[in-house]
């Protein structure tokens, strides 16, 4: 049980670092979509998509230690994928700015609080 707890803390700390990277890179991704620089931003979106899937997996595996709503995460991801498939880059940039960015900031805060709480117990 102690090993599982330590692994969960490590996974959540890594997720916090990744969320910080997402929060720093999202504004440039949003601007590139708004400026129709689709070729330039495509690789970044693939990396972001992979990262969001990884975050979802971490959230599910560590759900006993935090209050992140995985369904909310999955719903946001599905909307982003739909916008990408429709090639609606204005919608995509809005989803990234007004849906994903606030969610990632919230998830980061929740994970930080969870790690602190677990570490003191």
Where are these regions (language model features)?
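C-terminal-biased regions
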Residues: 1-121
């Amino acid at each position: 049980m102690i090993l599982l707890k330590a692994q969960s803390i490590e996974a959540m700390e890594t997720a916090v670092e990744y969320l910080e990277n997402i929060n720093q890179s999202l504004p440039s991704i949003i601007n590139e979509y708004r400026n129709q620089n689709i070729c330039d931003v495509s690789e970044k979106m693939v990396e972001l998509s992979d990262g969001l899937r990884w975050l979802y997996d971490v959230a599910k595996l560590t759900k006993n230690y935090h209050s992140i709503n995985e369904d909310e995460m999955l719903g946001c991801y599905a909307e982003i994928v739909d916008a990408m498939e429709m090639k609606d880059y204005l919608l995509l940039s809005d989803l990234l700015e007004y849906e994903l960015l606030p969610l990632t900031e919230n998830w980061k805060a929740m994970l930080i609080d969870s790690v602190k709480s677990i570490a003191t117990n």
